[in-house]
């Protein structure tokens, strides 16, 4: 179903499906991390409710619905200039050069070999944090945001290699 949503959103907006899949991967491991961020970002594409409610972005859809949020992400990337310069669009999505680089890296992998999608969809989550890179294993779920320090105390196996 995710692949259909990426391709549908791509057809509707012109944003490459691989970029949408890569954003979804970086944001929530393609929906496997289900929670609200410390910044209050929500859903599979991690929208702030204020961004979601901008005219033409959420369009009355459900912030937690993969189909709705993937289409909203495509519209948001267009609004932020992604059709002219995808790096600029990604900067508008998350103002981090590392974020954009990671998304474009995964998008390039998907473009080179579309079957990579299957392995990325079922992979452990690699998460860049203030403490370094963490591994979030499949099924990771917290009802409330958790600080990196608390996460590492509870799950030391997620710690970055030293």
What is each stretch, according to the model?
Residues 1-134:
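Catalytic glycan-binding domains that act on GlcNAc-containing polysaccharides
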């Amino acid at each position: 179903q995710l692949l259909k949503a990426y391709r549908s959103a791509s057809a509707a907006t012109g944003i490459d499906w691989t970029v949408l899949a890569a954003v979804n991967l970086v944001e929530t491991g393609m929906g496997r991390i289900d929670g609200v961020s410390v910044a209050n970002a929500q859903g599979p594409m991690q929208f702030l409710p204020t961004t979601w409610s901008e005219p033409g972005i959420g369009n009355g859809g459900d912030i937690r619905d993969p189909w709705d949020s993937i289409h909203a992400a495509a519209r948001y990337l267009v609004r932020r200039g992604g059709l002219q310069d995808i790096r600029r669009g990604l900067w508008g999505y998350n103002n981090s050069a590392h974020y954009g680089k990671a998304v474009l890296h995964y998008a390039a992998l998907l473009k080179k070999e579309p079957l990579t999608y299957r392995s990325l969809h079922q992979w452990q989550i690699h998460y860049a944090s203030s403490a370094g890179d963490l591994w979030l294993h499949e099924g990771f779920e917290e009802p409330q945001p958790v600080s990196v320090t608390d996460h590492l105390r509870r799950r030391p196996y997620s710690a970055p290699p030293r």
